[in-house]
Amino acid sequence: MSSDAENQASLKTYLRCLEEAKHRLAFAESFAVGSTGHPRVDIESACLQFRKALELIAYAAIAPHREKYSAWRRQAKGSKDYRKDFNGKKILHSLSRLNPYFYPRPLLPAVERNGAKHFEPFRGEYLTKKRYEKAYDRCGAILHADNPWGHDKQYENFSKEMPTYIEWTRTLIKLHSVLIEHSGGVAAWLVEAGDLTTKARGYIGKGIGEISVDPNYYG
């Protein structure tokens, strides 16, 4: 089980990644609305910034699981150094094998009940893990030059979808919880990424008794 100092260091790394991701999303949004006047350049620039934001979310997800992730990566056939990992989609796949509930769980604002704050799950639209993977792949394809004998990358369609993906991503990280499995049981982080006018902040909690998890919630 990690020490309090290690947990705080991991949380600090997590928040730093989310801070940068927020700004990357803002840059992606500015390009998505056509800031350069060149449609192809706009969507390619938006994809670059958005993909970097997705990778930062993946890096953030490593932070609370770093010890287990590092040990698991040392058993890999190829590169064994997790510090060289860069593919967001592959990072998510690896983390899923270590903790199926690692993915951020968006929440509604707190409600006061009996002197305590309660956070209900957000049930609307957000960037699910499946949507993350789809967006990551689509951005990757668009970032390469067009092969004149290849397939249509559907620039125009993805350009129209990009604002929705950005909004889903903001919803994912704005206020969420992270469940962490360790030798002492289950811990939970509560994280507020906020917006560009506020700094991301987080709180480390420890499970008391059982923590109920709905497997269908994590998609």
Residue ranges of model-derived segments:
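Extended intrinsically disordered or low-complexity regions, especially N/C-terminal cytosolic tails and loops
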Residues: 1-29
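A generic structural signal for ordered alpha-helices
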Residues: 6, 24, 31-32, 38, ...
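Short, solvent-exposed segments of well-ordered alpha helices
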Residues: 8-19, 37-48, 70-71, 122-133, ...
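Long, charged low-complexity segments
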Residues: 3-7, 78-218
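N-terminal interaction modules that seed assembly of large macromolecular complexes
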Residues: 30-87
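Generic structural concept
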Residues: 22-25, 29, 47-54, 133-136, ...
